[in-house]
Amino acid sequence: MKISPEIKSPNMKLSKVYSILFLVATLTLTSCGIYKFNDASIDPAVKTIKLGFIENRARYVNPQLSPKLNDKWQLKIASQTKLTRTTSDDAHYIISGTITNYDASQTVGVSNQQASTNRLTVTVHIVFRNTLSNKTEEFDVSRSFDFDANLTLTQAEARLLDEMVRSLTDDMFNRIFSNW
């Protein structure tokens, strides 16, 4: 006697496909709750943030740095946290800052009695106040950017501005929100 193969209806096949898709979607969505795409660790009680303007008070002022740094800083906070911006002094986090150093210098490496690279060092002083815990922390974020000694400072600034802004905002964010 011959055993006939099991005949599957199209509805059964479709049902299996839907079951597999449902399982994959469920696993994907639940795994997103376990892993974060950024390292920001913010107390769930913190809901609001006030960002003060980062003013340039360095001896030499690059007129483009402060506005670009402020714009990038605000965008980073908005895109990588769920905090609501406010202008109120009773915000849960209050962050202000000042560019305190913007200095070009020659590096030690010398070729034919002339420095082969120069270095631009930028320092931002940050005041971070957590009004929920009534704690204030002050710290400096400093970065150095090397550039070819054949370039003028103006040329180097034009080439380095985006990198300076990105690096400084990343360092500020990591220091405040990622406990670095």
Residue ranges of each PLM-predicted region?
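Tryptophan-rich substrate-binding surfaces of secreted polymer-degrading and adhesive proteins
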Residues: 1
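Bacterial N-terminal signal peptides that target proteins for export
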Residues: 4-21
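Bacterial N-terminal signal peptides
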Residues: 19-30
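A structural "domain/chain start" motif
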Residues: 30-82, 90, 132, 142, ...
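Surface-exposed short loop/turn segments
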Residues: 37, 44, 79-84, 89-90, ...
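Compositionally biased, intrinsically disordered linkers/stalks adjacent to structured regions
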Residues: 158-180
